[in-house]
């Protein structure tokens, strides 16, 4: 999550998924909202990967990953480290709905109705599987809301890295707003039921053909520039920062790594969400809904497909103050938030196969 810094964009018509193109047969494209923190052009992406000394040497094929979505300058090589194991052509993206409160959205997953999303190497097609899933869900469990997708940065951060290694990717963007655990269970069950039917009908393999990418930034920590809120329960000196980091690693180790289970997913929720109000933070991970919803979907999908259990591997953890920011200014990019002991963000990367 970033400090409030958004660019004005044209209002977009909120269309149904059953209307893929406008009357003039022009494709409906979702444009990039954050061209400061993320790459918009191919030359920017090529330059970033060169500066990161990227080599595509990951022999693993991940079925699911949990990845950050903050400025490239801060997250750095954590992006390719986690995303280069995503080999599937069709990728279901579970993102954060940072502005859900502004649109009074909760307890429904949020789809878009765009034909494609703008990306550095050309528009990325939205998979036809999206509409198939949407049509299978009761109206009460989803909404199609292009406006919130158009101002949300959590998914567009990932697409350039995914597209860099596979120009043919197709995506299914999903935002997860405030949501109770019971509602997560209900919706994920129905999504998995339909997804299983689609995979069987088309001979699609999980990992090879379809993958799930879940995004969250980890703790948003500090006592400055958080909209007047204090997110530093351990303090902001060196000891407080160390304790906050240790708390982060405890969450990752006990909830996100090893064999995935409903108990671990519930435990993650208990770490991050207030027990008496699921809308409120306990520990400030912006993906306090996208992570459990995405992992529940993965857990249930494994139960009806692979049936061998899903296991999470810790890839890395870093923060926006661990290392000097990657220099991106010569690429006409920058940062959208400060990074110091009074304002920093954590980044967790976990992969599942």
What do these predicted regions represent?
Residues 1-4:
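Positively charged n-region of N-terminal signal peptides that target proteins for export
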Residues 8, 12-24:
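Bacterial Sec-dependent signal peptides at the C-terminal "C-region" and cleavage site
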Residues 8-9, 88, 280, 339:
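Exposed boundary/loop context
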Residues 10-11, 106, 298, 305:
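Amphipathic, positively biased hydrophobic alpha-helical segments used for protein targeting
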Residues 20-292, 296, 300, 317-325:
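Active-site histidine-anchored catalytic micro-motif
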Residues 300-353:
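Long, Lys/Arg- and hydrophobic-enriched amphipathic alpha-helices
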């Amino acid at each position: 999550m970033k400090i409030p810094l958004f660019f004005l964009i044209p209002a977009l018509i909120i269309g149904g998924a059953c209307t893929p193109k406008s009357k003039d047969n022009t494709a409906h494209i979702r444009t990039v909202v954050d061209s400061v923190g993320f790459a918009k052009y191919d030359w920017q992406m090529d330059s970033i990967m060169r500066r990161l000394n990227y080599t595509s040497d990951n022999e693993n094929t991940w079925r699911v990953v949990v990845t950050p979505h903050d400025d490239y300058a801060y997250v750095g090589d954590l992006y390719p480290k986690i995303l280069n194991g995503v080999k599937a052509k069709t990728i279901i993206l579970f993102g954060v709905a940072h502005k859900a409160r502004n649109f009074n959205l909760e307890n429904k997953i949020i789809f878009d109705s765009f034909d494609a999303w703008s990306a550095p190497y050309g528009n990325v097609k939205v998979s036809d599987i999206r509409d198939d899933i949407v049509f299978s869900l009761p109206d009460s469990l989803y909404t199609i809301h292009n406006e919130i997708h158009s101002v949300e940065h959590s998914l567009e951060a990932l697409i350039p890295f995914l597209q860099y290694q596979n120009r043919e990717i197709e995506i299914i963007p999903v935002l997860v707003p405030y949501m109770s655990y019971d509602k997560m269970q209900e919706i994920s069950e129905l999504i998995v039921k339909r997804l299983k039917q689609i995979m069987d009908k088309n001979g699609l393999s999980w990992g090879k053909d379809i993958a799930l990418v879940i995004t969250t930034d980890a703790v948003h920590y500090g006592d400055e520039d958080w909209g007047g809120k204090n997110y530093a329960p351990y303090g902001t000196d060196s000891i407080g920062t160390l304790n906050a980091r240790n708390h982060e690693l405890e969450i990752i180790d006990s909830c996100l790594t090893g064999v995935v289970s409903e108990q671990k997913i519930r435990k993650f929720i208990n770490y991050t969400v207030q027990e008496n109000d699921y809308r409120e933070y306990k520990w400030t991970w912006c993906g306090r809904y996208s992570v459990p919803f995405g992992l529940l979907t993965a857990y249930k999908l494994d139960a009806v497909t692979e049936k061998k259990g899903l296991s999470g591997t810790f890839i890395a953890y870093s923060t926006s103050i661990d290392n000097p920011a990657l220099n991106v200014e010569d690429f006409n990019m920058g940062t959208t938030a400060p990074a110091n002991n009074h304002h920093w963000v954590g980044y967790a990367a976990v992969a599942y196969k």
